[in-house]
Regions:
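Proteolytic cleavage junctions
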Residues: 366-370, 374, 409-413, 426-434, ...
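Surface-exposed, glycine-biased beta-strand/turn segments
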Residues: 23-97, 104-109, 123-133, 138-139, ...
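Exoplasmic/lumenal beta-rich domain surfaces
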Residues: 97-133, 199-223, 259-321, 498-528
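Low-complexity, Pro/Ser/Thr- and charge-rich linker/hinge segments at domain boundaries
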Residues: 168-193, 202, 266, 352-374, ...
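Conserved structural position at the C-terminal beta-strand
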Residues: 240, 336, 539-541
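Surface-exposed, short loops/turns at beta-strand junctions within beta-sandwich domains
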Residues: 322-329, 457-460, 524-532
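Proteolytic processing hotspots in large secreted/extracellular or virion-associated proteins
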Residues: 357-359, 364, 369-370, 392-436
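Short beta-strand elements
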Residues: 212-213, 254, 340-360, 549-555
Length: 555
């Protein structure tokens, strides 16, 4: 028996070691040396995804040192003009991985190795996986400096912690591994009532009522209209917002539980996030309303094409059926909790009765787009192919062409998958390579002329038109030599910058591109011998228009 026990423990230890998991729990330190103040937290429902980390504010400036939260090794280094920008991945000896994003620069030894790799590949953008023993990191070691790189709206550190085996981001705000001041409970601003109508024989939910919420004398929330009447299947959506102490930045909530007459019919909690399902955040919120408000409008409803694993209870998908008797009430009690366990309750009643809801969903010149089957719209001017499971629930939509504009559904309806628009257009042969689609905001949306048709693959319903990009990108030199840099401003009027190449004295030179500021920066080598240098910059847009400048600069 003892031998079997020893063998089992040895096997367990070996298994955990192979998986990179230690039985010893790690104590994580802060990645910064100042009190943490957040501009974003884990679980915020952002455009097409859940936010996966803590956004630690940098006080409006770049350059603060970033420290490794635990002992480990650098397992990945990612550099891009987009997304996390300059990002460092440190895997710890319990198997978890910390991600540090939007960095200004890496620690010198890491930065030099990355630069060597960039020159070897002749690319600013790189995705690198260093050998495990190349960069061993101590707890508290400076590994990088806080920045504003990539798709960042201001200086901050994006920090996340990913689980050992799944590599899914964990809700480190809720696990409270760092000290973050927060005794502010979530705020309920409104409650929206959606009723099920039948349009062309298809059940469709539409907004029936929006009621303001207010705090009562006990500090909890109620509706300004305490009883909502309904006579059809319904669901509720809650307009909620949350803050941290002393901050005006809005946060996502951790969990919500809705009870009907004391029985839970809907509950979710965001303990972790899966990259494979994160886009279903579009169905987690009431998409069109969330786009219009500061905060989240969270649906107490699970749409049929919503594969999020964060729902723990959803009786009848959160749909509430009206009582049989006229005037009979249902007591709704909903508890909303933030990631520091501050909670808010709201109570009100639903009762069977006339909601006075007038269905405004059009039933003429519309198409039914099912969530669970392929759909194709076709007319004399275009075809639109929408694969099954592209929309989150069956939708009623309009498709039309007026001689210039292609109306493809409604931009307030989100998409999970790509759809394909094909249009029959008589485009002059010399312009076919320059043609592209433009969306309702006037921005280039892509598209190519293929086999006699303009083809667009998109994940956005919108109104599109066809335009032509025949203008080469613009290049301007900005303050040459300032701060030991050679800086350019590169822009394109429509299709966007596709690539660039900088050479100095005929050799490829590293240049950092930041689309936010349209800047391209080459940093001089330290202790370089002052001399005149021949510079060539080539910029190509997505319609293959090319601009090349040649100049000479001395440094």
């Amino acid at each position: 028996m003892k031998i079997n026990k020893v063998c089992f423990l040895a096997l367990l230890y070996a298994t955990l070691s192979i998986a990179g998991v230690s039985a010893q729990e790690i104590t994580y330190r802060s990645p910064v040396d100042f009190p943490i103040s957040l501009s974003g937290n884990v679980g915020e429902a952002r455009s097409n995804h859940f936010h996966t980390g803590l956004d630690i504010r940098g006080g409006g400036v770049v350059g603060a040192p970033i420290y490794s939260v635990a002992k480990g090794y650098v397992s990945r280094i990612f550099v891009s003009p987009y997304g996390y920008g300059k990002a460092l991945y440190v895997t710890h000896f319990d198997g978890t991985t910390a991600v540090y994003g939007h960095l200004d620069r890496f620690a010198p030894s890491i930065a030099q190795w990355v630069e060597n790799q960039q020159y070897a590949r002749q690319s600013f953008s790189v995705d690198l996986y260093p050998p495990r023993n190349l960069f061993t990191i101590s707890r508290g070691q400076v590994i990088a400096y806080l920045g504003n790189s990539g798709s960042s709206g201001g200086p901050h550190l994006h920090f996340e912690l990913r689980a050992a085996l799944s590599m899914n981001p964990m809700n480190i705000g809720h696990s409270r591994i760092f000290s973050i001041a927060d005794n502010v409970p979530p705020i309920v601003r409104k409650v929206h009532l959606y009723l099920q109508d039948t349009v062309l024989g298809v059940p469709i939910f539409s907004l029936a009522a929006t009621i303001d919420a207010k705090k009562n004398s006990t500090g909890q929330y109620e509706l300004t209209t305490p009883i909502l009447y309904f006579e059809k299947p319904a669901y509720l959506a809650y307009d909620v917002i949350d803050y941290k102490n002393g901050s005006n930045f809005t946060m996502g909530i951790y969990s919500m539980e809705q009870k009907v007459n004391g029985t839970t019919n809907f509950r979710f909690a965001i303990d972790n996030i899966s990259f494979t399902t994160t886009r279903y955040s579009n169905a987690f919120t009431q998409y069109n309303l969330t786009k219009q408000t500061r905060g989240d409008v969270i649906r107490a409803f699970v749409a049929p094409n919503n594969l999020l694993h964060n729902y723990m209870t959803n009786i009848n998908d959160g749909i509430i059926m009206p009582p049989k008797k006229l005037g009979e009430r249902l007591k709704i009690t909903t508890t909303i909790v933030d990631d520091n366990n501050n909670s808010t309750n709201i109570e009100f009643y639903l009762a069977r009765g006339d909601s006075r809801h007038i269905n405004t969903i059009p039933d003429n010149n519309v198409s039914i787009v099912p969530w669970d089957r392929d759909f194709q719209y076709r007319d004399h001017a275009m075809t639109v192919d929408i694969p099954a499971r592209s929309v989150y629930e069956t939708q009623i939509m309009k498709f039309s062409y007026d001689g210039k504009y292609y109306r493809i559904g409604d931009k307030n309806i989100p998409l999970q998958k790509f759809i394909v628009l094909k249009t029959i257009d008589l485009i002059e042969p010399k312009l076919r390579s320059k043609a592209l689609f433009v969306n309702s905001a006037g921005h280039g949306a892509g598209g190519e002329f293929i086999d006699g048709q303009m083809v667009l693959r998109t994940r956005n319903f919108d109104v599109y038109s066809i335009a032509y990009d025949t203008i080469k990108p613009s290049i301007a030199i900005v303050k040459p030599g300032a701060n030991n840099t050679l800086k350019f401003k590169i822009t394109d009027n429509l299709s966007g910058v596709a690539s660039y190449r900088l050479t100095i004295n005929g050799k490829w030179a590293l240049a950092e591109y930041d689309p936010k500021t349209s800047s391209l920066v080459h940093r001089f080598k330290p202790n370089a011998t002052p001399q005149e240098r021949a510079i060539e910059l080539k910029v190509v847009d997505r319609k293959r228009n090319v601009n090349i400048i040649n100049t000479k600069q001395k440094w």
